[in-house]
Amino acid sequence: MIKRRAVYPGSFDPITNGHLDILRRALGLVDEVVIAIAYNHEKPSGLFSVDERIEMIREVTAAFGEKIRIDSFHG
């Protein structure tokens, strides 16, 4: 069976209830959502480091189980 996957890019600095609402809605349409955290070392740092954002997202999306994957990219 083919897995339906969505990519949700953003800075997530920090993740908000609005982000979580979009994730819930997306998971009603696809099997997996990849949260792609954007960062740019050439710009001033935001509120949280990439590692802190990843940890926050892991904590608040734990209930979604393996339907959520978190990655980061430079952009």
Residue ranges and their predicted role:
Residues 1-75:
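Nucleotidyltransferase catalytic core that binds NTPs
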